[in-house]
């Protein structure tokens, strides 16, 4: 009798264990789906931690090797004239890096092109992440008559090297936008760039489509001015260094290379998210962003593929110039796009079919003192893709 009861208990325990693990895995998958930003942040942090450990091990190995070589030379040179065996393992450190930024007494000429490395660009910026109302931001910048309606500004003491449209995808981040503008407007003014802000806001019930918003913003921005440089800027990314020049170049630019929530390390080499820049010519050549990425994730990886497929490489700022702080919880509430990997495998085939050339939309345009607001209700029917 006891043996029978034991046999009956075993399946029950196994069933309970199976139900427990099923419930746990289902809860985990649901969390990954509804809170992808948090999950991916932790995954990127773990990946960055692995990179940091690997780099530290390389550094330790190099230091040990250097110490062994020094000891060997020291023993050898104890009986030989030191001048016969010069030891200079740190010869590269003897050369001081000379600054390429112009001196404080640099003279501007109104008919000359603004330089890229100006004395007003000091480097690290004091970051203030505290919340601030848009009314306060309006009051702060209303003292500058050079800022025109919609946030248009250009220098008066030199000819701007680049005319830059700053495109910001937006949904329910009203507390983040004034924090970004508080830092970005003064930085761009110090860089002597002509610029304007375009906040592209998605309404409706569809999942957030960051890439399609960028395409809409591009089309609307080009109606205002013959911009030659485009900066695609997440609203929660605050630059920490004003020497991170927001002009464009011969190759597409990835500005946000070191984000605080990723331990200031690049999560992976193909990472192209946060803040990026392309010339208008480059953006048109790659057919813009893809429109098919509904939900969080994948569109910046597809942009990387498009850039590579078009024969470009990606440039990045050196050292700590590309450091950014991230306003927390930007992606909370945005669902994970589970179909992104299937689309990424077909990036090359889709590039000529999905982007600027299949984009349709209806925009409601309003003007703020500091930006142009472009409101759109996006649906998949507005950017249908033919078979490929």
UniProtKB/Swiss-Prot annotation:
Q: Which residues bind UDP-alpha-D-galactose?
A: 169-173, 208-210, 235-236, 264, 296, 329-330
Q: Name one GO cellular component term.
A: Golgi cisterna membrane
Q: Topological domains (Lumenal): residue ranges?
A: 36-388
Q: At which positions is Mn(2+) bound?
A: 236
Positions that bind N-acetyl-D-glucosamine: 298-301, 340
Q: Indicate yes or no for the key word Iron.
A: no
For the keyword ATP-binding, the answer is: no
Q: Which CDD domains does the entry link to?
A: b4GalT (cd00899)
Could you tell me what induces this protein? (Microbial infection) Up-regulated in response to porcine reproductive and respiratory syndrome viral infection.
Cytoplasmic membrane side: 1-14
Assembly and interaction partners:
(Microbial infection) Interacts with porcine reproductive and respiratory syndrome virus GP5.
Q: What is this protein called?
A: Beta-1,4-galactosyltransferase 5
| Gene name in the database record | B4GALT5
């Amino acid at each position: 009798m006891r043996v029978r009861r034991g046999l009956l208990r075993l399946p029950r325990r196994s069933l309970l264990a199976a139900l427990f693990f099923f419930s746990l895995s289902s809860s985990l998958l649901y969390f990954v789906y509804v809170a992808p930003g948090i999950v991916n942040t932790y995954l990127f942090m773990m990946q960055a931690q692995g990179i940091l450990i690997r780099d530290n091990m390389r550094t330790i190995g190099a230091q040990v090797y250097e110490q062994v070589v020094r000891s060997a030379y020291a023993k050898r040179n104890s009986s030989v004239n030191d001048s016969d065996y010069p030891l200079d393992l740190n010869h590269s450190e003897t050369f001081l890096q000379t600054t390429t930024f112009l001196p404080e007494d640099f003279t501007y000429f109104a008919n000359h092109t603004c330089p890229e490395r100006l004395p007003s660009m000091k480097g690290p910026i004091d970051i203030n992440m505290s919340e601030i109302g848009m009314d306060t931001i309006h009051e702060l910048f209303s003292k500058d008559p050079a800022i025109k309606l919609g946030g248009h500004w250009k220098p008066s003491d030199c000819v701007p090297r680049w005319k830059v449209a700053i495109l910001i995808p937006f949904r329910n981040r009203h507390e983040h936008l004034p924090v970004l503008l508080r830092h970005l407007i003064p930085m761009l003014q110090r860089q002597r760039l002509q610029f304007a802000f375009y906040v592209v806001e998605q309404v409706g019930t569809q999942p957030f489509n960051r890439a399609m918003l960028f395409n809409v913003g591009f089309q609307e921005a080009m109606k205002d001015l013959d911009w030659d440089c485009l900066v695609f800027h997440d609203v929660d990314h605050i630059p920490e260094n004003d020497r991170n020049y927001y002009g464009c170049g011969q190759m597409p630019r990835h500005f946000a290379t070191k984000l605080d929530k990723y331990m200031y390390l690049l999560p992976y080499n193909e990472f192209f998210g946060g803040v990026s820049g392309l010339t208008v010519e480059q953006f048109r050549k790659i057919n813009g962003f893809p429109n098919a990425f509904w939900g969080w994730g994948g569109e910046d990886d597809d942009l990387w593929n498009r850039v590579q497929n078009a024969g470009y490489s990606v440039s990045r700022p050196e050292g700590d110039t590309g450091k950014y702080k991230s306003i927390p919880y930007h992606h909370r509430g945005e669902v994970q796009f589970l179909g992104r990997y299937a689309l990424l495998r077909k990036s090359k085939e889709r590039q000529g079919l999905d982007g600027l050339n299949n984009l349709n939309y209806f925009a409601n345009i309003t003007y703020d003192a500091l930006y142009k607001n472009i409101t759109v209700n996006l649906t998949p029917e507005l950017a249908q893709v033919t078979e490929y």
